[in-house]
UniProtKB/Swiss-Prot annotation:
Record key words, sorted: Cytoplasm, Methylation, Protein biosynthesis
Modified positions (N5-methylglutamine) in chain numbering: Q233
UniProt cross-references to InterPro entries, sorted A to Z: PCRF (IPR005139), Pep_chain_release_fac_I (IPR000352), Pep_chain_release_fac_I_sf (IPR045853), Prokaryotic/Mito_RF (IPR050057), RF-1 (IPR004373)
MF (Gene Ontology): translation release factor activity, codon specific
Its job: Peptide chain release factor 1 directs the termination of translation in response to the peptide chain termination codons UAG and UAA.
SUPFAM superfamilies: Release factor
Protein name as it appears in the record: Peptide chain release factor 1
Protein localization: Cytoplasm
Changes after translation: Methylated by PrmC. Methylation increases the termination efficiency of RF1.
Region (Disordered): 286-305
GO cellular component, one term: cytoplasm
Family per record: Belongs to the prokaryotic/mitochondrial release factor family.
Length: 360
């Protein structure tokens, strides 16, 4: 492990030297590439320097304990040594996590699809609540959101909404949101105050670039139609909405939220690329495909990754057994505590798998 950190430090020093080279500075593409690598290595180098500093403190303390010391001073050194050794164990775990293989999609933008499952109007209302939760979370992180397609209902909410989130590390933070989200509350339409259960499915896709997916124009059927709003009424007098069908796979994507047909086509192609990219990833990694299917499922009430219980003010993530009693804050975009816990569990699982591989 430490050889990898030493190699990272050597490369970091080399990049520092190259970044002062006028020829590199003049080549913007090369300069940006090196700056990105520099930033990634800096995290490793900082942690490695902490490790070297701590191991030196431990060695110095042990050497001091070999000398003749008065009782009070010896106890102080022994306490400091114990604390440093405990810090070192924590630091080693953090260093192992830093060496875990990175998900190549972590830094990508995302496309999020939210669809009402079981529960009719109430599911559509909760789809709207989740849309607001994710857009508020994006705002907190300084990320940009844009609706690509939506099917609003007359009483508020969405039958479905597709939107993009652009920002550094968006996929790394939101990829665990894919799945069935269950809500338990008294619907606004319920006269006698009974609690109903509804579900909403969420799918988070890493946004694909044009270079990631090659699409043959002959494989596409493109239809235009008039954009409609809640209840089906037409909101545009021209056929600006776009429906693209990818004939080889049968995938269909729509976009009607832009006034321009050209912009709607551009946004629809973005969604199609990301869906095809995800399909290719699933074929390459069958275990990921199985995991994703079990997460997203059918929208049936029995399948869930998270429950939002309004009467109790409770949100429970069933994958990790985490329960928080701050439903209003969470639906206002305060979801970092859940996301951090999911990432920590994922890292622990990868570390455990790595340890098993080492034993093999």
């Amino acid at each position: 492990m430490f050889e990898k950190f030493q190699a990272a430090e050597n490369r970091y020093d080399e990049i520092n030297h190259r970044l002062s080279d006028p020829a590199v500075i003049a080549n913007q593409d090369e300069y940006k590439k090196l700056m990105k690598e520099h930033a990634e290595l800096e995290v490793l180098v900082t942690k490695y320097n902490e490790y070297k500093k701590l191991t030196k403190e431990i060695a110095d303390a042990k050497e001091m304990l070999n000398e003749k010391l008065d009782k009070e001073f010896r106890e102080m050194v022994e306490t400091e040594l114990k604390e440093a050794q405990e810090k070192l164990e924590v630091l080693k775990k953090e260093m192992k996590i830093l060496l875990l293989p990175k998900d190549p999609n972590d830094e990508r933008n995302v496309i999020v699809e939210i669809r009402g499952g079981a529960g009719g109007d109430e599911a559509a209302l909760f789809a709207g609540d989740l849309f607001r939760m994710y857009t508020r979370y994006a705002e907190r992180n300084g990320w940009k959101t844009e609706i690509l397609d939506s099917n609003p209902t007359e009483i508020g909410g969405f039958k479905e909404v597709v939107f993009s989130i652009e920002g550094n590390g968006a996929y790394s933070r939101l990829k665990f949101e894919s799945g069935v989200h269950r809500v338990q509350r008294v619907p606004v339409t319920e006269a006698n105050g009974r609690v109903h259960t509804s579900t909403v499915t969420v799918a988070v896709l890493p946004e694909a670039e044009e270079i990631d997916v090659e699409i043959n124009p002959n494989d596409l059927r493109i239809d235009t139609y008039r954009a409609s709003g809640a209840g089906g009424q037409h909101i545009n007098k021209t056929d600006s909405a776009i429906r693209i069908t990818h004939l080889p796979t049968g995938l269909v994507v729509c976009c009607q939220d832009q006034r321009s047909q050209h912009k709607n086509k551009e946004k629809a192609m973005k969604v199609l690329r990301s869906k095809l990219y995800e399909m290719a990833r699933e074929q390459q990694h069958n275990e990921i495909a199985q995991e994703r299917k079990s997460q997203v499922g059918t929208g049936d009430r029995s399948e869930r990754i998270r429950t939002y219980n309004f009467p109790q003010g409770r949100v429970t993530d069933h994958r990790i057994g985490l329960t928080l009693y701050k439903i209003d804050d969470i639906l206002d975009g305060d979801i970092d505590e859940i996301i951090d816990a999911l990432i920590t569990t994922d890292q622990a699982s990868k570390l455990a798998n790595g340890a098993e591989d080492d034993e093999d």
